Amino acid sequence: MNVPEVVEYARGLKHVAFADEGKWSCSVDYLAKIKEAIKEHNLNRVVIASCTPRTHEPLFKQTVKEAGLNPYLLEFVSIREQDSWVHMGEPERATQKAKDLIKMGVAKAIFLEEGEEIRLPVQTDCLVIGGGVAGMSAALQIADQGFQTILVEREPKLGGLLNRVSTVSHDHGVMPAPEIVRVKATLVESHPNINVYTGTEIESLQGYIGNYKVKLKTNGKSSEEALDISTIIVATGMKELEPTGQYEYGSDSRVITQLELEELLRGMSENSELKVKDVVMINCVNSKNETRGCCNIGCSISVKNALALKKLHPDLQIHILYRDLSMVKEEHFHLDEAKGAGIKFIRFPDDRYPQLVKEDGRFVIRVYDILLGKELEIPSDMLVLTTAFKGNETVGQIKGYLKVSANSDGFFQEAHVKLGPVDFPSAGISLSGCAKSPKNFKESCEEGMAAAMRVSIPMKKGYIEAEGIVADIDLTDCSKCSLCYKNCPFSAIQLDENKQPSVIKALCKGCGLCAADCPKECITIVHYSDEQLLAQVEAALEESPEKKILGFVCHWCALGGVDMAGVSRLQYPSNARLIRVMCSARVPIKLIERAFELGAAGVLVVGCEFPTCHYITGNYACEARMNRAKKKLSKKGVDPDKLWVDWCSAADGPKFANIMRDMVKQLNLG
């Protein structure tokens, strides 16, 4: 592009007092020049037109701050990744696009207002819900740092599911579960910083990080006073999903589950009599099907328990029938040992589960062996079912208290599988162990410690700090519909006794879902207000709107895809003028309608790929709203096919480039 021409154009824009060109704008020397210009020209807004804001915006924010300007009075425009790198063969169009992008940046900057980071004090009291190995590991980790910890367990004693288990895999061997529970429980109960409440449930819980009020009920008796809690760890564990009605489970005592076998093994020794000769285990009962995936630990449990039986009774004939053997690396020694001990493994097809038949009162298991390519009949005195798991009964109650999500099996959903694997969306609440998904002993302990680490951070700092991009509610026109309260993914909006909403700014992430959905339009997002976004829309479409596609891209994934296309030098048509929003859920229907009123050839909204979203439910909210937008456009006589909605990961530059090519082709803009 012709950079000097772009700079000269910028100088001529209304309200622009100074414009300059810098080859290395992020260098120390040029950053110093920016600070000098702010002071010399008494600038009260700054627009940086260079690379992507995803990498360098914090650097320039700090620069303007050092010059005495509020960092939220900076607007960043990407003319490299969005323009010069992707339109290398058409410099004139790239130059014109750069002018438009800068004009859009200036239009928004005019309406920028000062923002500030918000701090919320956090004390040093943590509540751990659940006294299994994950909960005990978390409690010990927190208490060892000097924080007061309250551990609540609804059962009469600590240990959770381990109280029913015989052994656990550990360091290429097994350890007796009762001994593990005894050692862990002793450490917890004797720790000076841990208060243990067994036989106790949560009666009420309300508040937010640094300001939770919790009431307990112990052995049916309610506590008189509420406890002050700053952070919470949910470690409520899981339970075995009983396969009632399958393979005659529940009607024939010879059919048991792996957990019931564990209980038998707890009471067995080498001298124990076992009145069976043939044991068959069927894996993946109620798992790896249309309703749920792999249970993660079933294969390891079946192999471990088969070995335990074989060691106690070497003459036993044991068959393990499986679809796939999914075991973590550290537990593969069990598999080799089992094969060496004579335990037989038979793989059956996904669509052809083993069948149970009775011959003269004895079990016969019919199974198709994939390796042999034929059906086998295996006699059995005991049939052990490796079943799926589900969350504990308390999940519904805890979910309601904390405003968090759980799947259909009652397992809590983390904020993000990669970026927040032990976090809930709301700050100050973590989850661990089998409350999230089935896990082995080692994983549960590690996740308990990870959750402890996460909640320890704000307790050590003494506060949490939120960026200034937050929601602000003007109550003048508020209808008290509570939509913002219901839809906020982060529980950052609270209602008073009159249903009047207010924003807990330290919890708000600035996604904008509430603002876009507010029927009275009385919610503003600092730095992404309707006024600012509308100014960008109108600036983008001021000239030749019939040749332009107006795009809204989320900062986290979609813009990452745009940037990746740029870094990869993927060439696509120059028709798009993109507006950055923090989340696709921020895009209100009225901006789309306005774009078409101004004559836009098309509108594109791109959010995060499903099922992930930086703001948990943002892309789902966007999808629902865009469906409504299409219907409204159709009623207004606008072709709804001119509104494109798509989803893009941060690494998917080729996909974004293809979206642009396809859209230009369909709209006949070539």
Range-by-range predicted roles:
Residues F345-F348, C648-G670:
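C-terminal functional segments of enzyme domains
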Residues M1-K548, V553-V567, Q571-I589, L598-T617, ...:
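Residues forming the flavin
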